[in-house]
């Protein structure tokens, strides 16, 4: 089968062959041919599969056997039988190819040869090599010669391999000037032996089996686009020649695990670097000011920490960052793990620096990317650390970067937390608050906030706290692993402190490492040393004696009634009063008893 792209000419052997003579379908370069081989006098023109090229129709006359070319606006397939007695041509319109997608700006200087160009044989000058086996009759009479031909072909192949190693195995692209492609290269001499290499502008090498490539090779000096893909390269060494004109470099789909860190030292014009589907763990540094687009997808050994340094460099842009991953060493609460994190997630860490708070009249906070919080369903978040310490602030910053997990406001003059933890969305993700050495007098502002539900660390040492709210005692340490630091605060101690706060500190001593250093402001001792018996004594309460007084009065009243009744009975029965009653002065009411 003979397939050409863009243009083709009939070979003399094709013009003389019989149209009815069957030909053997011969696999070439490891590719199987499943379709039957057409007659030699038929020539098919196939449009390229990637980049559309003007199609060429071939017309063939029986008398002269000459081939003429005609360019059409649409791809066509032309087949002309040799048995025609007059010059005829038949044109069958091929289905319209879909419009090629618009090429990204960063690929405008890149050259790639279609894969099908490597599927057919060529001689050392870029012409198609004669198909020897294709012209051997497969009739029964020729079967006896098959074994001998196979032996000769095997010997010829070994000789060809030896000859090809020292001859040019590259071919000029049929549609793009000064652009060459090389296929199935096992030695660099197959490229360096080509003529006029210094005039090459673009080069695409497919299936290069050389393990190590020296980038300082003069072959690459004049190139603007270099693609070495679909091979078995494992290592690149040295750097490109000085003042290289290279604008596009693609080494995708190899086994490369090592790249020189200074390979771009003398490549000032590079715009695209494709290194996808390799075994790389690092991206080489790019010290030029020019922007460069890189594709690192498919490198499953890529490390996040060095990659994050490159991401912070504004001159790097990434292709498909959502599906380009790197290995991140994550530290969880109880263990460490290695997780896959997308470049898109790493790029979001840049916002931690760009949105760092600047406080008028006080100065700028310092922000840095701390780590990545791994969440399921590819929703991992970068942790931003905001340091606003030692600025003399009197209130909290009005806004923080997104995904701020750590806020450090140590050594300021802040007196109140305000309503930031309740109403400010940029405070909702904080799980570590470092607020030592301030003048904060209350933590009631934490009540009902997301912070009190999610925090892991609170540092409130050396502040002006006077009381620990009851809600804080009940809810702050419900989850294990949380830590609260309150040393240096002088609380107002009373009986309730001795009963409730002291017990809370004893029960949560592991969660409050400095509980021994929490002191009282009204008693010269620490809270943990309070004695309930002393603090909970109450002054005498005279209301307890009222009941005794009432009881005594009732008893006296009953005794008086009894005495009067007795005296009356004695007087009625004996006619005289008892001695105590007779000595008592008479009262105006005594006449009632005498009547």
From Swiss-Prot:
InterPro entries on file: Leu-rich_rpt, LRR_dom_sf, SLRP
One family name in Pfam for this protein: LRR_8
Matching SUPFAM superfamilies: L domain-like (SSF52058)
PROSITE patterns per the UniProt record, alphabetical: LRR
The keyword Glycoprotein is annotated on this UniProt entry: yes
Domain LRRCT: 489-538
GO biological process: intracellular signal transduction; pupariation; response to ecdysone
Domain of life: Eukaryota
LRR repeat ranges per the UniProt record: 403-424, 429-450, 454-475
Glycosylation sites: 250, 255
LRRNT domain segment(s): 347-402
The entry's keywords: Glycoprotein, Leucine-rich repeat, Repeat
Stretches for region Disordered: 1-42, 64-98
Free-text function comment from the UniProt entry: Has a role in the ecdysone induced cascade; probably indirect control of 'late' ecdysone genes.
Protein name, per record: Protein halfway
Organism in which the protein naturally occurs: Drosophila pseudoobscura pseudoobscura (Fruit fly)
